[in-house]
A protein has these predicted regions:
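Alpha-helical segment of the N-proximal tetratricopeptide repeat
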Residues: 205-246, 256, 260-263
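Long, contiguous interaction/recruitment modules in multidomain scaffold/adaptor proteins
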Residues: 72-77, 83-217
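Glycine- and acidic-residue-biased ligand/ion/polar-headgroup-sensing regions
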Residues: 5-26, 45-53, 57-61, 65-94
Length: 338
């Protein structure tokens, strides 16, 4: 299973009135809005009668910041309570999901699951009318044949928590999910029951706090990401894509997850939408973040020049914000590619 990233994240839950944020390492303030990601060292400033809520990096505690003050995001949070989110770093790249002629696994893929009877989904193959589906593990061998592109695992034989399983799909055209370049990492395992209880308690705590709908979804997705329940994080956020959300963090989060689990055509779509919204809103930080994520997808799609162009564009955005750490990080990446 994945190795955690190094940075803890905070979430700006909502903003009532006028507020700004200043990122750590940057010299400029920018307008604050609900859904924004924050990190240790970031400052939040309220004006007039403004009020903001910040969800701490323990992923459940929330504190309220009142008007006419400036505070670091950690100010109202418990000490030493942060978790490291597992996706979204520049190096979180996984091959896979790039050949539309293959029935590559969509879900469950490089994830922990909580449901012992998961829905299995794969990419549709043109011309295919039947698919043979297998679930393979050290204690499970199961097979069925279906005409669609999804089927629910019946729970028999039962999955064992902590054991790696693999879904294999073969179309009647001969195309196989095993030909996907990311098939080796496209495994899943069942969450232990005691961990499931903890996740459910944390999700319930978020739901009790009255977050705006999309911010609540982002906060719940963070809890799932913490536990490697990436399929559930996706299932939490994708309905907002279907409804046409303009909250760019939804697309950014999905792009990060898809890139991490090796669904790179889907990652490309989500990052491109984040870029479009950030461009329209003139949000420099978000635009640079989405471009740097899309850049990594482009190299996995064997488009290295597109990656370099996007990294240079992202670097230009960070330069406008005087974010020296990200400027240097992207320059090192550019140097690796040229």
């Amino acid at each position: 299973m994945p190795t955690p990233a190094t940075a803890s994240e905070f979430l700006l839950v909502d903003v009532n009135g006028s507020a700004q944020i200043k990122r750590s390492g940057q010299s400029q303030y920018q307008s604050a809005r609900g859904g924004m990601r924050l990190n240790i060292g970031d400052l939040v400033r309220t004006e007039g009668g403004a009020q903001v809520r910040i969800r701490c990096s323990d992923l459940t505690t929330t504190w309220t910041m009142n008007s006419n003050i400036e505070r670091g995001v950690v100010w109202g949070c418990p000490p030493d309570g942060g978790f490291s989110l597992r996706v979204g770093r520049q190096s979180d790249n996984t091959l896979g999901g790039i050949d539309p002629t293959l029935p590559y696994i969509v879900t469950p893929r490089r994830t922990v699951i909580s449901d012992p009877q998961p829905m299995l989904r794969w990419n549709p193959v043109a011309g295919a009318s039947r698919y043979t589906v297998q679930v393979i593990g050290s204690d499970v061998t199961w097979e069925t044949e279906v005409s669609g592109t999804q089927v629910q695992y019946p729970g028999t034989p039962p999955l064992t928590p902590g054991v790696d399983y693999r879904v294999i799909v073969e179309a009647d055209t001969g195309a196989s999910s095993q030909l996907d370049v990311g098939s080796e990492t496209a495994t899943f395992e069942l969450l232990y029951p005691e961990d499931l209880d903890l996740v459910a308690a944390d999700v319930a705590q978020i739901r009790e706090q009255g977050f705006p709908e999309e911010t609540e979804a982002l906060a719940i997705a963070d809890i799932y990401i913490r536990e490697d329940l990436l399929a559930e994080a996706i299932a939490t956020l994708e309905p907002f894509v279907a409804s046409g959300t303009q909250t760019l963090e939804v697309y950014q989060a999905l792009g990060d997850i898809y890139r991490y689990i090796g669904l790179n055509l889907l990652a490309e779509e989500r990052y491109e939408r984040a870029i479009a919204i950030a461009t329209s809103n003139e949000e420099i930080q978000a635009l640079a973040d989405a471009r740097s994520g899309l850049a990594e997808v482009k190299v996995l799609l064997e488009q290295p020049q597109a990656e370099i162009d996007l990294l240079i564009q992202a670097q230009s955005g960070y330069e406008r914000l005087n974010d020296t750490e990200r400027i240097q990080e992207l320059q090192a990446r550019i140097d690796d590619l040229t």
